[in-house]
Amino acid sequence: YNRTLKKAERWADEYGGRIAATPREAAEGAQIVFACVGNDDDLRSVVLGADGAFAGMAKEAIFFDNTTASAEVARELHAAARERGLHFIDAPVSGGQAGAVNGLLTVMCGGDAEPFARAQPVAMAFGRAVTLIGPSGAGQLAKMVNQIAIVGLVQGLSEGISFGLAAGLDMKLVLAVIGKGAAQSWQ
């Protein structure tokens, strides 16, 4: 299932499988459902309601959400899952497109330990580190820590470049040199 039918068709053509008309249809019979959408509202739209994934999931199934969303929506959907006899793990990722393509994402998880332990080996197919940080919402909060750290790195690089330019340095040369030392960052 994809909210954009053309994307689902392309994926099915390339990798095989069947296209589901709704999240509910896609989730029917699955022990673990993985999802990654744009934001809180998108997440609610694919999870809740008569055609949402929760409606099609069997008791004790796990919804493993890789969306970068709010900790509040993670807690909300965790509670909604519990009411239905399901499990919800908030599991935002870090590593960018290259990490996703190469199975090297870092996955920061929030939720209950038992369903996490069941889902972790499956998530290792796309993650090099899949870690339970704490209760529901903790994965989203850890992702916020990650984003704050990245912003600090980008800000520091900007300040360094500004300083170097003001000092009259050849910044192409400086960046090439510091890129081989402790200032190296894949970002």
Per-region residue spans from a language model:
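Helix C-cap/helix->beta junction micro-motif
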Residues: 15, 83-84, 167
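Rossmann-fold dinucleotide-binding core
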Residues: 37, 68-147
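NAD(P)-binding Rossmann-fold cofactor-contacting core
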Residues: 1-15
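Small-residue helix-packing motif on alpha-helices
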Residues: 8, 26, 116-119, 174
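Helical "substrate-binding/catalytic lid" subdomain
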Residues: 118, 138-187
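Rossmann-fold NAD(P) dinucleotide-binding segment
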Residues: 19, 23-87
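Aromatic/hydrophobic pocket-lining residues that form π-stacking "cages" and hydrophobic walls in ligand
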Residues: 8, 77, 160
